[in-house]
Regions:
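Short, intrinsically disordered low-complexity segments
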Residues: 1-2, 159
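Sec-dependent signal peptide recognition
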Residues: 2-10
């Protein structure tokens, strides 16, 4: 009889544990370096185009049907330069909603990041674009010279199914190497590693996140430019600043998906969807939660080719 009671007790304990433990699946989708490729047609070369946000949207809709609100759609900058459609709304029609804002709002982006070619358009253009977006454009290392405060929101917090996700945005600091100060007057661009160290401490203490995502408009082959600007330092930041689960890269137009270990031995996924909307970075984060605490976290990523998708998706 005692054995029967013991087995029953163990079953009750197991059932109790399973009732308090749940699995949460998150999907992160990333575009980068779209360069005005909103439509599947290259207006410069006057031919059909394999990339575009129109094709990306078909894939996004497919994934939203599977993940619902547990999907976050992120963009990593360099959207305001490239195809004539972007230039038209940059400098010709400066009254209407910018096509980049309109399309990204329609697609339901959750956050964006600044790229060097967005800065290239000048204050009047990128300020208007930022204001018209229904989601935050991030930039933790874009600093006002007047008061040393961030010009843009440094990070955004999302809560999905009991999981807190923080997305921290940064841009390559080498802007002064390429662009005259008249385009970014009143700003300076701080070092990415120093900025990440500062904000990671704040994020961990204030937000107590379950998942931290870095979205950096920078590649992964770090080098110093003009003797002072650390360019393409995404991998360096991932390795040297503990706390990131995922680092989303861009800027160098190179496809990349792989993991590195940070200085504490934790694995960090790095992913880069190249350019022009041909590829989307797709990240899966699966968490086992109990009483609001993370028991286990698995992160994986793939690059999805949008050439396989048409541009005629409709909302359900």
């Amino acid at each position: 009889m005692r054995r029967v009671y013991s087995i029953a007790l163990l079953l009750l304990v197991a059932l109790g544990l399973s009732a308090t433990t749940k699995e949460v699946k998150l999907k992160l989708l990333e575009t980068s370096d779209i360069h005005g490729n909103f439509f599947p047609y290259n207006f410069i070369e006057q031919r059909e185009w394999g990339g575009s946000l129109a094709r990306v949207y078909s894939f996004v809709q497919e994934e939203r049907r599977a993940y619902g609100d547990n999907l976050l759609l992120l963009d990593n900058g360099d959207i305001l330069q490239g195809q004539p459609s972007a230039y038209y709304y940059n400098f010709m029609d400066t009254v209407s909603t910018h096509i980049a804002s309109a399309m990204m709002n329609y697609m339901g982006y959750n956050a964006g990041n600044m790229g060097n070619h967005d800065v290239e358009a000048g204050h009047a253009v990128f300020d208007r674009w930022i204001k018209q977006c229904d989601f935050p454009i991030l930039g933790a290392n874009i600093i006002r010279t007047s008061d040393r405060e961030t010009y843009l929101k440094p990070y955004e917090v999302f809560e999905r199914d009991g999981v807190k996700i923080v997305v921290l945005g940064m841009i390559t600091p080498a802007i002064p190497v390429w662009l005259p100060e008249t385009l970014w007057q009143g700003l300076y661009f701080a070092d990415m590693e120093e900025t990440a160290r500062k904000w990671m401490k704040i994020i961990q203490e204030k937000e107590k996140p379950d998942v931290v995502v870095g979205i950096f408009h920078a590649g992964n082959e770090a080098r110093t430019m003009s003797g002072q600007y650390r360019e393409d330092a995404s991998m360096e930041v991932a390795q040297r600043i503990p706390g990131f689960d995922v680092v989303i890269m861009g800027h160098d137009h190179r496809r990349y998906c792989g993991k590195v270990a940070n200085i504490e031995g934790d694995s960090v996924l790095l992913i880069n969807p190249a350019s022009n909307g041909r590829v989307v970075g797709s990240v899966d984060v699966v968490l086992k939660m109990e009483h609001g605490k993370v028991l286990d976290k698995q992160v994986s990523g793939v690059l999805t080719d949008c050439l396989l998708y048409t541009s005629d998706a409709a909302d359900d």
